[in-house]
């Protein structure tokens, strides 16, 4: 399985392989991974990133601006084995009022062969002090041409003093690994924070059931991780503890926030204020059913990109002055269907039902 990871293109674009367009227009703001295996031929292939100019794309992304980055920074092609990990969802959550937590690890495994295939899937979990607290490995049979979800739910004892917060940004280390025929085939290292978020009827975001005091700052990452880290540290020194980007950020931004101890309200790359008050069908892009799929793609991409980061305390459907309508209703329903306890925020809801706080 061969994938193209793309970001920092600098414009909306489409992907062509060997002269054939394989994607619809993709927005410039959301880093994206595209499966390209079905379009590759034996021998040499040509991949083209072609800039497109579609009026509807601009209408959804008004007032969004990217920092200046070298074009195609962090763009690459990577390959995965035909039997292996497609994605994962990980949480380390408290168990009632007890002094321990429970890891919830969902691993999505793909088998693209036409035959059932066997593998061994396991993980190691280390606490922030480097102590091995749990490990397991099991054998599974994955049906031909299918995707299976394998769930682990072990307890993690003596976890309370490792509760993640802005003042105590302690991170566990987990390693997912795949073996076939006794040989290690895949390693996936990840950082996990022990935290549980929610919200109450007062519109407050909760951490371990208690309201968070948030000093928010609108912020998008700089062109590189080093500069961004310096800027975040400076903001923390001024008392800022919550960053509100305008669109999905590079992976390293969320990892920095996990490590530095700063909360993030992530946001889909949706902003259309100029027609926000026009609630006729098609008046605002948010109420144009023809754009529903593009809205859902952007919101889903935002969630999938950030879901495993402990610094994420809420998800925003779009800019505060973006109009409401059919597409925003569907976007809210889509995010709700994922079962995440973190609140969904849409300031443009203006009293309607498609926002949690």
What are these model-derived regions, one by one?
Residues 86, 174-236, 255:
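N-terminal carbohydrate-binding accessory modules
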Residues 227, 242-357:
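Substrate-binding/catalytic cleft of secreted carbohydrate-active enzymes
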Residues 1-86, 112-113, 128, 132, ...:
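Accessory beta-strand-rich segments of carbohydrate-active enzymes
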Residues 39-44, 106-200:
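Extended acidic/polar, glycine-enriched regions
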Residues 81-97:
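Low-complexity, acidic Ser/Thr/Pro/Gly-rich terminal tails and inter-domain linkers that flank the onset
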Residues 158, 167-170, 223-251:
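Aromatic- and glycine-enriched glycan-recognition loops and surfaces
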Residues 94-108:
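Contiguous beta-strand segments within globular domains
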